[in-house]
Amino acid sequence: MADLEEQLSDEEKVRIAAKFIIHAPPGEFNEVFNDVRLLLNNDNLLREGAAHAFAQYNLDQFTPVKIEGYEDQVLITEHGDLGNGKFLDPKNRICFKFDHLRKEATDPRPCEVENAIESWRTSVETALRAYVKEHYPNGVCTVYGKKIDGQQTIIACIESHQFQAKNFWNGRWRSEWKFTITPSTTQVVGILKIQVHYYEDGNVQLVSHKDIQDSLTVSNEVQTAKEFIKIVEAAENEYQTAISENYQTMSDTTFKALRRQLPVTRTKIDWNKILSYKIGKEMQNA
């Protein structure tokens, strides 16, 4: 092991550490970070070399953060990334600094938004917040209005998690939806992601995603937002139901098929008497 450590350069050590951090299960970033810190045994190298991994993890996981002085949480996503560690809260029209290691927001300041699309963004956000409140008790959503390739675009992000470390499991739901404001109809594109980790007496992970495409009728802001939510609700319900049904099918068929109903001898074993069987055999061989 010592020889292997001597062969690894600092760059290689940081690269390996960064991979561990980026792939940390939801709710277990601190545990993975602390383990990697012990393995690397060089805090300065870890903080400087793996800083990009801390940021990538929060962006990928849609990490929610509370900003002091504001009621609602905002998601840390690539769509709100303003560079240099600053992020946008489109609802409150502020930008703030975010510490990717401590997961803390500081220095909130007023920030400009795309006024041309703000009425559309607000309508979608209002409808989406009502949907999230109904379907995700711990859910957080953030809606962005941006110009992408000259087109006015709405991007809606949802995050909901359950962290149950005492019960040895953690899980997170993420979904991202996009559509452009175009006359008559537009295309809605979404991606749904589920990640769950169960680690009592084992290590089992569920990592699943599904891509969605649908058409949306564009009229006024409020009606378009309502139609958009119908698409979101139908797709997310269908996805969650399908996963539940697949797990039930696996439990009823696949896992049962892996178990042998009877041992090779075709005779059931009385486990309460197994010890006496062993003692008797040893006595016969004596």
Swiss-Prot record:
PROSITE patterns: F_ACTIN_CAPPING_A_1 (PS00748), F_ACTIN_CAPPING_A_2 (PS00749). The modification Phosphoserine is found at residue 9. The keyword NAD does not apply. InterPro entries: CapZ_alpha, CapZ_alpha/beta, CapZ_alpha/beta_2, CapZ_alpha_1, F-actin_cap_asu_CS. Gene3D superfamilies: F-actin capping protein, alpha subunit, F-actin capping protein, beta subunit. Belongs to the F-actin-capping protein alpha subunit family. This is F-actin-capping protein subunit alpha-2. It comes from Aotus nancymaae (Ma's night monkey).
